[in-house]
């Protein structure tokens, strides 16, 4: 009895210590990268305009227009992308469903051969395939997972993807505009807040990539800062030329 309890305790400890990150990033990845995209693009846009020595009102309007246009563009693109992917998956599932209905024996043999190729004994592979093929819906799910790498019960929603992308982009793009909306009369507070936001986004990305937070933060700060520097230089150049 003591041995069984000890083995159970060791198994429980192993399970607690043997956890893996979600390599797909879950909701965090698209949210962080959407916000980062909004922050970098709107910061670069506003910095470029500021480099042209325009009025404060022009910079604010540019930032708000960039936020709105970018967020809607991201949402539309994400909706189209996810909807197209979902339609493709549904089409593949329809093909598999039709094959299971018309040629059940062939599909069962296919599944058995798949398990055999993974090292399962032939007799056991055939028995497992036979048992799994008794329920048509279960058979469809198994074939989708094993042959197509698809989870029929976990298809992404285009609407959720679009709304998430819109919100994340808008949130990131709002950072360089926010100081102006709160009464700032120069571009420096907006730039400072945006740079802090860049470092913060990079630090959060470290949760997905498993890199050190300071390295990820500094890398994103450097990339965003470089984009802002280039657009500022271009804005200054063209502003001087036009002026």
Residue ranges and their predicted role:
Residues 184-196:
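Structural signature of hydrophobic alpha-helical transmembrane segments
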Residues 232-243:
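Juxtamembrane boundary at the C-terminal end of a transmembrane helix
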Residues 200-227:
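Interfacial loop-to-transmembrane junctions
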Residues 2-30, 82-165:
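Cytosol/matrix-facing amphipathic helices and coiled-coil assembly/linker segments
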Residues 23-34, 56-64, 124, 158-163, ...:
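The feature identifies polytopic integral membrane transport proteins across all domains of life
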Residues 27-46, 152-178:
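Transmembrane alpha-helical segments and their cytosolic interface motifs
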Residues 2-81:
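Internal alpha-helical transmembrane segments
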């Amino acid at each position: 009895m003591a041995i069984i309890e000890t083995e159970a305790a060791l198994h429980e400890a192993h399970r607690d210590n043997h956890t893996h990150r979600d390599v797909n990033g879950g909701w965090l990845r698209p949210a962080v990268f959407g916000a980062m995209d909004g922050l970098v693009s709107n910061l670069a846009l506003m910095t470029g305009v500021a480099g042209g020595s325009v009025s404060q009102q022009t910079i604010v309007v540019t930032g708000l227009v960039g936020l709105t246009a970018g967020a809607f563009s991201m949402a539309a693109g994400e909706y189209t992308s996810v909807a197209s992917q979902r339609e493709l998956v549904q089409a593949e599932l329809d093909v598999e469903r039709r094959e299971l209905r018309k040629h059940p024996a062939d599909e069962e043999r296919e599944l058995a051969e798949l398990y055999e190729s993974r090292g399962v004994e032939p007799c056991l592979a055939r028995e497992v395939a036979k048992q799994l093929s008794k329920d048509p819906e279960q058979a469809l799910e198994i074939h989708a997972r094993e042959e197509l790498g698809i989870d029929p019960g976990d298809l992404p929603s285009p609407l959720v993807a679009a709304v998430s992308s819109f919100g994340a982009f808008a949130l990131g793009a709002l950072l360089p505009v926010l100081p102006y909306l709160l009464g700032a009369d120069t571009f420096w507070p907006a730039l400072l807040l945006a740079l802090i936001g860049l470092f913060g986004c990079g630090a959060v990305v470290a949760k997905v990539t498993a890199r050190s937070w300071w390295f990820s933060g500094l890398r994103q700060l450097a990339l965003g800062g470089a984009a802002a520097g280039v657009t500022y230089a271009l804005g200054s150049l063209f502003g001087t030329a036009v002026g």
